[in-house]
Amino acid sequence: MFGSARILSDVTLRLRQNLSVHGVRVQNINIGGGVGGEIPDNKRLVYALQNLHGIGRSKAQHIVAELGVENKFVKDLSKRELYSIRELLSKYLIGNDLKKCVERDVGRLVGIQCYRGIRHVDSLPCRGQRTHTNARTRRSRKTFSGSR
């Protein structure tokens, strides 16, 4: 039973890493090394790094400049360059670690019942924005099960 689960997980991992959609091949390179994330290998390095949660345009350009690597396709990078990217990315708070940190910070605000925490609980903007005519997305009613 457990062997079949391992085989299935191995198959799904391979399918995720080499996915074909409408004849277009999409293959990812696992960053790993505590970073946790995959970047597509068919894009240039600056744009591929932006697929990681917590890395935007400026941080991706800063990373490439700090490494001194050309902005070439990820599939053309050497193993040494990939290793240096992993080392540099391990210094940043990205991916699930960043999501957990933000969630913990909001939970702290809710726990001490400050103004911002109360606004988070009420699903209202917490940085002084107008709510009479705007903030429709933030103010949208949450549907409860059993109500019409």
UniProtKB/Swiss-Prot annotation:
Protein's cellular compartments: Mitochondrion
Main location: mitochondrion
Positions of region (Disordered): 129-148
PROSITE patterns attached to this UniProt entry: RIBOSOMAL_S13_1, RIBOSOMAL_S13_2
Chain segment of the transit peptide: 1-27
GO cellular component: mitochondrion; small ribosomal subunit
Example GO molecular function: rRNA binding
Endpoints of the signal sequence: none
Biological-process GO terms, alphabetical: translation
InterPro entries: Rbsml_uS13_C (IPR027437), Ribosomal_uS13 (IPR001892), Ribosomal_uS13-like_H2TH (IPR010979), Ribosomal_uS13_CS (IPR018269)
Basic residues: bias regions: 129-142
Similarity section: Belongs to the universal ribosomal protein uS13 family.
Function, in words: Located at the top of the head of the small subunit, it contacts several helices of the 18S rRNA.
Subunit and interaction comment: Part of the small ribosomal subunit.
HAMAP family named in the record: Ribosomal_uS13 (MF_01315)
Entry protein name: Small ribosomal subunit protein uS13m
